[in-house]
Each structure stands twice: as structure tokens, then as C-alpha cells.
Amino acid sequence: MRISLLAGSAVTVLILAGCSSTSDEEPARVFATPDGPGLSAAVTEDALVGHLQELEAIAAAHDGNRAAGTAGYDASVDYVVSQLESAGFEVTTPEFEFETFEAQTQTLSLAGTEIPVFALSYSPTTPAEGITARVVGAPAGADGCETADYAGLDLAGAVAVVPRGVCPFGAKQTVAAELGAAATIIVNNEPGPLDSGTLGDPETAKIPTGGVSQEDGAAVLAAPEVTLTLVTTTDTTTSRNIIAQTTTGSTENVVVAGAHLDSVPEGPGINDNGTGTSAVLETALQMGSAPEVTNAVRFAFWGAEEDGLVGSTKYVEGLSDDDKRNIALYLNFDMIGSHNAGYLAYDGDDSDKVGEPAGPAGSDAIERTFVERLAADGVAADGTDFDGRSDYGPFIEVGIPAGGVFSGADENKTAEQAAKWGGTADQTFDENYHTDQDTLANVDRAALAKNGAAVAYGIGVYAQSVEGPNGVPVGAAREAARAEG
């Protein structure tokens, strides 16, 4: 059994069931005071790094990754479950199915020249020799979201070329397919490749669809004919979430704290998202399964986040109306130790006026909790948009307030941010994002420690109260707020 000793702070001692009075008995497990200050002091950098070392070793033993549906992910589940059970939690690992997509061949040729193209997830496959057809571009100013955008044009058997934006990729290829197009090429609407994107699901996908850069889009449109080859496969895979809840605290104001456990297939996923996993896990271990808290805390470790937030979406979809009503808030932790780290709190009040609107009522208060905690640690946090790229998405969708901290992914750090946080301006927060270099060696340990303490603090604060200046709607106010949403 693992023993945690917290010097200089109040602790709660739980003698685990089954201990005897003999000299062979297991020693008492020591838990932290289950509030913001107590938990933030107890969640140490060394403990977080210890979990990351275990996850990295798991990846190394399983083809270098911990992706959903693989043995590496299953071993990661086993590790987290064993840790939680050692702290007395009753743990469930509900299974779910999801579709996995892989592109074996991705080529686009015009006049003998190869142009980089990337298959959008769930794109149907072309014949092995590809599709050779004339090019028909959406008229200038048209976005390809409606059949009227192609008025007067003959798409039958053609490769439709449309700009990114306005409507989902799936809608663009559906419109082109309805007009008889053989394939679709979507051109990025900003510099750089269009190397990720999805058609939604296999049922939505109608015709082979790839993405090209803004720079290459002009050449494609100017070509009379192109050959597109996308050899792809879509398979049904099973994965699991991990759920563990305290036996104490109100079940009418549940605090859900989550992190996705899976990596991408390309690497071990130690920052993304071993760091978030380690912080949520260590907070659970320090809190224990029966802490003296006002509100129950539900710890969640999501599967298949990298495949489209699948685990968290399946979980929320499976909740009854009462289940959703009884969740006071959701705290999300996805990447907290980026190599060129930022200190970001989800912009619950939309004060930054960037991207998506404010989160559900109470999200502004959650943002304040984390901003204030980081400020107490000498860090002036910035906001980060609820852009739908992590597991808060399904919770926000049903009106549950959300928040958390984040150290940045593929966005660039600004000069102003580098001046106040250190690091390198005009470079991405994590150049190792979704690569085989997402390793412990490339985790910013100072950011891991500060953000890890903030994770524990936020969970502890709301475990004790979801009301007050930084509280969220409760009772009738919650009903009203979610009805309006």
C-alpha cells in the first residue's frame, strides 16, 4: 500500500477495513484535509511525476502509445483503477463503442505534381487507383453549404472544391454528393494545412473528402483535372471510462472532476493528457473515498477523447434528467504541463470575446476560482476559449457549468504571455503536441506543479461548497438557469 505523509498540515486518518491489531497490519493511510488549501498542499510535484513515469512506462511497453482501443490504454485503465481502489474507492469502468478511422493512402495529383492532402475522418475510401475527374469549384463568395451555391454548375462525376468555414465539413460533402460529385476537396481558410477534421460519423460520410492548405487550394482550383486517392478504413472499437465517487457529501450537488486518459496513436501522451490524469488521480488519492465534504465528488477518466470526445459524450448521453440536474459543475483538466507552458483558465464569462460564447451560468465563477488560485501562486492567468476541443463540451451542451486550467496546445504564445510567464514568444505552447515527443522529458515541471495544485484547490473548494461568491446555481436557481439555456 502506498503511504502519503503530509507534513505541517491538518490530516484525516482512515484505518482501512480488514486491518488487524497484529504487527503485520497495514499502516493507517493518511488523507489530506479535503478542502482547497489542504488538497493543494498535498498534491505535490513528485507525486504527479510518479504517475507520469508509470504512464510513460505503460506506453513504452505497448507500442509507444496509450490510444483508446489498444493494450496501452487498457493498461492505463488498470493502473488508475488500482490506485483508486487502494484509496478505498469503489470503481466502475463502463464500456462504450466508437468508430476508429485510419487513412493508409492520401495523395492528390494534378498535372504530374503531388500536393499534400489529408483525409477527413470517416471519409469513404476511393478505388485503389484513385478518382480522376474534372474540378468544379464553388463560386467566389459561396461556401458550399447549400445546393444553391452551385447553381448553374454541373457537379456530376466531378471533384468539388469548396472553402472551409460557415458549416461543418460533413455538410459540405453532403451537398456535393447530392449534386453528383465523386469527391470533395476542402480548402483551408487560413494559412497552413487542413490536416485534421471530421465528416461527423460514418453515416454522414457520403463521398471521399480530403483537405488541402490555403496555399495549395488555388492550384487545385486552376487544374482542369485531378486524381485523388484516399484509401481509408473505419472500424468499431470498444473502450472504457473510469468513474469513482466519494461515499460522502450531497448527491444533489455533485462535483465532477475529469481528465481524458487516452493518448493519440502517435505517442505516449504524457502532457496530453497524462498531466491532467495525474492531477485528478492524485487529488482523489489525497482526498480518499470518504472525506468530510459537503458535496460528493465524482472523479472521471475519459476514454477516446482523441477520437472525438467519445467517452465523455457517451457518459453525458447516458445520464437521466435527474442525474444531470444533480451535477453542480464539471471541472476539466486537459494538458497542464506544456513544454512552453501557458497559464490559462477557461473563459467562463466570455470576457475575452474570442470564439464561443460564455459557458452555462456559474462558469464565470469557476473561472474566478482558478484565476484567484493561480494569482495566489504568483501567476496572472489568461482566459482560454470554450472551443469544444475537450471533454467539457458535452457537459456545457446540457447546461452544466464548467471550468478548469490548461497550459496550451498548438496555439502560439504571445510576446505579452512570454513576458509574464517565461518561455518563448511566437512558438506553440507545446511543440510536442500529438507527437512521439510528448514525453515526461518535455513536460514543464514548474507548470505541472502550479497547475496541479490549482486542480486540487478547485476540486477541494467545490467539495466544501458550491455556493458563495464563486458558487454556481443551486436548487430552483439551477433549474431556471438550465431551462433558459
Give residue ranges: language-model regions.
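Catalytic-core environment of secreted peptidases
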Residues: 45-63, 70-71, 81-87, 159, ...
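Bacterial signal peptide processing site
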Residues: 20-22
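C-terminal motif of bacterial Sec signal peptides marking the signal peptidase cleavage site
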Residues: 15-18
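His/Asp/Glu-rich mid-to-C-terminal helical/loop segments that flank catalytic regions of hydrolases
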Residues: 412-481
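Noncatalytic luminal/extracellular "stalk/propeptide" segments of secretory-pathway proteins
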Residues: 25, 34, 41, 45, ...
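Metal-dependent peptidase/peptidase-like ectodomains
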Residues: 43, 265, 292, 302-413
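Soluble metallo-hydrolase cores and metallopeptidase-like ectodomains found primarily
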Residues: 121-145, 201-270, 282-285, 289, ...
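Extracellular/luminal Protease-associated
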Residues: 70, 116-212, 268, 381
